[in-house]
């Protein structure tokens, strides 16, 4: 499918769950999932399988979603982040493959909600963290690190506005000093890092006010409205038992060979930390400049191309971080759009 296509113009019988259609595993998403798991310092499951997640919602024409609950493709990863409070490791609980659902589009003028099934059946990789975040700053730092990793790996272009990088935030509050986590809500429709920061601030205030007023925080899925700067209830949040998971009968279990894994390990590119070290050593860049240049793959590609053409590395770096970034900000252009 393509971003921006007219609704329901990129569909097939498999997407819409027509009787008699059977799913087929996309080999490329398996490669991308393994590469991502390795880049996130996770353990790849050599023998994994798929499950059916059963629920009824208008954007899911089959009334079930092919996913991985019991034996996901990757587990126990780790991402190191740096904030004003210092360095911290964010634990990755699991990484699993699943198919995308459709999209509901609400028309306020007609007071109608319509279904767009263009995304149905498109494979995706979902990364689930442990509840290690304590501030919005940590969440954004993690997402920036994740975006950089996925771009370097060539797994995704990470355009949040186009949905190729999405983030659902699960949030709960608890009294200071308490070890027990509170009732969580899940927030969707978060299309930018700024929206994520604002949504976390709003939902934190809402839950605290709810508890202070003697009300109960409901476990539910909430939709972030960027224009109203608030979250709104979408539906109750089910537990795993409510989805009645069972093994997917139409996709056989996967057995990954060591040869397959070694081949993907060999394809792992030079990542941001290694490039930072090399730029400081070979080009004499400061630690801060090297960190800024390597933060996004698009900046690295531009820098490398300019230096390869004979431009002095330090001059290129200073121009990019100064004049170029200023112009991009003024014109609201992302580096990857250059």
Residue locations for each model-derived region?
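Basic, nucleic-acid-interacting segments
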Residues: 1-269, 281, 287, 308-312, ...
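Small-residue-rich helix-loop
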Residues: 328-338
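Long, charged low-complexity interaction segments
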Residues: 268-293, 298-302, 306
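Composition- and surface-driven signal marking solvent-exposed, interaction-prone regions
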Residues: 185, 291, 305-306, 332-334
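Residue-level detector of well-ordered alpha-helical segments, enriched
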Residues: 289, 302, 312-320
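Generic structural concept
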Residues: 294-297, 317, 321
């Amino acid at each position: 499918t393509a971003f921006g296509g007219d609704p329901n113009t990129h569909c097939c019988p498999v997407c819409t769950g027509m009787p008699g259609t059977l799913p087929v595993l996309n080999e490329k998403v398996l490669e991308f999932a393994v590469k991502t798991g390795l880049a996130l310092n996770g353990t790849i499951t050599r023998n994994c399988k798929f499950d059916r997640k059963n629920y009824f919602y208008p954007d899911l024409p089959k009334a079930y979603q092919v996913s991985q609950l019991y034996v996901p493709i990757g587990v126990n990863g780790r991402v190191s982040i740096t904030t004003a409070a210092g360095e911290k490791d964010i634990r990755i609980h699991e990484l699993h493959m699943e198919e995308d659902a459709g999209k509901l589009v609400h028309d306020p003028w007609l007071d109608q909600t319509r279904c767009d099934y263009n995304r149905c059946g498109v494979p995706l990789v979902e990364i689930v963290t442990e509840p290690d975040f304590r501030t919005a700053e940590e969440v954004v730092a993690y997402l920036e690190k994740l975006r950089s990793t996925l771009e370097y790996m060539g797994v995704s272009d990470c355009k949040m506005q186009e949905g190729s990088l999405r983030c659902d935030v699960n949030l709960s509050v608890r009294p200071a000093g308490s070890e027990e986590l509170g009732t969580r809500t899940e927030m969707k429709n978060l299309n930018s890092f700024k929206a994520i920061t604002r949504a976390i601030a709003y939902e934190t205030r809402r839950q605290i006010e709810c508890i202070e007023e003697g009300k109960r925080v409901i476990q539910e899925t909430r939709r972030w409205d960027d224009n109203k700067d608030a979250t709104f209830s979408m539906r109750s949040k089910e537990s795993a038992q409510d989805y009645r998971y069972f093994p997917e009968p139409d996709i056989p279990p996967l057995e990954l060979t060591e040869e397959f894994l070694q081949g993907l390990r060999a394809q792992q590119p030079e990542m941001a930390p290694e490039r930072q070290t090399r730029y400081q050593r070979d080009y004499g860049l400061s630690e801060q400049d090297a960190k800024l240049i390597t933060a996004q793959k698009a900046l690295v590609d531009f820098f490398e191309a300019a230096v390869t053409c004979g431009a002095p590395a330090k001059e290129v770096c200073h121009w990019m971080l100064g004049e170029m970034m200023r112009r991009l900000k003024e014109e609201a252009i992302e580096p990857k759009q250059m």
